[in-house]
Amino acid sequence: MSRPQRITVLGATGSIGLSTLDVIARHPDRYQAFALSGYSRVDELLALCVRHRPAFAVVPSAEAAARLRASLAAAGCATEVLEGEAGLCQVASAAEVDAVMAAIVGAAGLRPTLAAVEAGKKVLLANKEALVMSGALFMEAVRRSGAVLLPIDSEHNAIFQCMPGDYARGLSAVGVRRILLTASGGPFRETPVEALLDVTPEQACAHPNWSMGRKISVDSASMMNKGLELIEACWLFDAAPAKVEVVVHPQSVIHSLVDYVDGSVLAQLGNPDMRTPIANALAWPERIDSGVAPLDLFAIARLDFQAPDEQRFPCLRLARQAAEAGNSAPAVLNAANEVAVEAFLERRIRFPEIAGMIEQVLDQEPVVPLPSLDAVFAADQRARELSREWLRRHGR
């Protein structure tokens, strides 16, 4: 019998990371945790290390590393502690690693995810920002290295499952007419537009269907999450933005659909639980038990669909415009959104101001080519500086 696959989980203490470890723990004969990373939740990372006994753990700073080393020693756990971006890149590209779960949220996940790609790993991509920021460079690295890129976002994983195996030949060549990206509409789908001025971070983070971290919950509430997913879908499936349509589907049971030229529409259904796409990607091309309950169609009884309201969700419009503009526009969009969401969570701006701030930054920052990773981070930094300048003028 072959040895278990060694998995690095980047972002182990987050929602995706914990779900990944849940699936791994269900199949100890197939998978083992090789390395786990965490950001601010050092105590939670300690507990995960004690339970899963990885070879390495990665934290952001020397201070956090010293604290974790002392705690691991006291617990009798031999996990080696690394720190910073260099540590993340090391465990993402290590020769012993078979697959990498890339689940660090935001721009911070780009370099370690790219390190895994360049090392030719099987990369389970939950960090959509990596593709949004550096799509052309990222996909070229995938082609050059021979890495296997498998999407973890439930929507992109659904599309992947509904696509023919040779979709890389081009959507037209395999008879795909369009991709239908489903969205729940979030907690404010029916909130009067004028009432959005007064919604709180707690309300924005109370998603009706999914359990997620705070940043992605706010992105879901603003539908920026769907906008970022639209951009990601364009890169993953080599689709023009016009070929990707967003459909609001409140039940979050159909995770996305692929429309073919012969009139067939293939959909992937399942309970809203991230362990399904995680298990699908971990085992691909095989199937394993994820721990998710079977879908009860009789309990669901109905499936509803509606067009997205761009007056209520201007972030979706901004993301589509950025996708169409290409070059640096998606990286600028992403950076401005990260700053805006953080400001909203800190109660420095109101919910509708997230889109207002992003739009102003997009208007101010010219669209330029991004020929290198340095150029990507330069565009990201300029957008963050413009965003902070906007906050100084307009924030509370």
UniProtKB/Swiss-Prot annotation:
In which residues is NADPH bound? 13-16, 127, 129, 213
**One GO term of the biological process aspect:** isopentenyl diphosphate biosynthetic process, methylerythritol 4-phosphate pathway involved in terpenoid biosynthetic process
Record keywords, A-Z: Isoprene biosynthesis, Manganese, Metal-binding, NADP, Oxidoreductase
Enzyme class, top EC level, equals: oxidoreductase
State the family named in the UniProt similarity comment for this chain: Belongs to the DXR family.
Q: In which pathway does it act?
A: Isoprenoid biosynthesis; isopentenyl diphosphate biosynthesis via DXP pathway; isopentenyl diphosphate from 1-deoxy-D-xylulose 5-phosphate: step 1/6
Q: Which residues does the annotation say bind 1-deoxy-D-xylulose 5-phosphate? A: 128, 154-155, 184, 207, 220, 225-226, 229
- SUPFAM superfamilies according to UniProt: 1-deoxy-D-xylulose-5-phosphate reductoisomerase, C-terminal domain, Glyceraldehyde-3-phosphate dehydrogenase-like, C-terminal domain, NAD(P)-binding Rossmann-fold domains
Q: What does this protein do?
A: Catalyzes the NADPH-dependent rearrangement and reduction of 1-deoxy-D-xylulose-5-phosphate (DXP) to 2-C-methyl-D-erythritol 4-phosphate (MEP).
Give the enzyme's EC designation: 1.1.1.267
Provide the binding site for Mn(2+).
Answer: 153, 155, 229
InterPro entries per record: DXP_reductoisomerase, DXP_reductoisomerase_C, DXP_reductoisomerase_N, DXPR_C, DXPR_C_sf, NAD(P)-bd_dom_sf
The keyword tRNA-binding is assigned to this record: no
Listed under catalytic activity are: 2-C-methyl-D-erythritol 4-phosphate + NADP(+) = 1-deoxy-D-xylulose 5-phosphate + NADPH + H(+)
Name used for this protein in its record: 1-deoxy-D-xylulose 5-phosphate reductoisomerase
Q: Which cofactor does it need?
A: Mg(2+); Mn(2+)
Q: Give this protein's Gene Ontology molecular function annotations.
A: 1-deoxy-D-xylulose-5-phosphate reductoisomerase activity; manganese ion binding; NADPH binding
